[in-house]
Amino acid sequence: MLFALVLCALTAFAQDNDKILNRQYVDQKKIHFGFSVGTNFQDIHIVNNGFQTEDGETWFADVPQHSPGFCVNVLADLRLAKNFNLRFSPGMYFGNKVVKYINSSAPDEVTDPLRRNQSQNIKSTYIVLSLDLKISANRYHNVRPYFTGGVMGVFDVAKDRTEQLRLANGDAMLTVGMGCDIYLPFFKLCPELKFCFGLKNVLQKNRPDLEDNPEMMRFTQSVDKVTNNMVVLTFYFE
């Protein structure tokens, strides 16, 4: 919804000035550079297995809500053809995910809150390397919509090593997105919405550090698979 409102407002502004074609030759450059700032919503998809502890407890993990993070990238754009560009945009993404653990087998008489539910805050600082193919429509006055598809490597440099669930630092993601080039008098503004889907199971099941701590180990034992997902709203300045 936010992306649609921002895009409509910027497009309307550009069309108000469409009698003058801004930056007419910018798309003919073989290579150009830029940068972006934006926000991201990080998520993880958790596959629970219904593991039961020795005392009969069954814990389930979930991410019930999401909070926005911040991201910044630099951009190198290579023109392949009239409507095709290859874009490389390394950067950093900051965000966090709150995992809730619920003991579904806790009887009503259990009053200790830690026996009923717990939470874990996973803060992430991703170094990202994103490579996308940009497929653009023909320019209409001062706007030009486009779609993107590509891959993104991520490496988390802010891992807490004592958490209930430990996730691998590295991951690879498939990305699809949409956006619009808006040609302004002094630069090209490109709001873009991108969806990122993790390709690997990032859960680290081998936890020798928790062999003597079954109270913590039960959370890892209750989960089979964890994959990263992310929604990113960025504004490119080119």
Regions found by a protein language model. Name each.
Residues 39-43, 92-96, 135-137, 151-157, ...:
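Transmembrane beta-strands of outer-membrane beta-barrel pores
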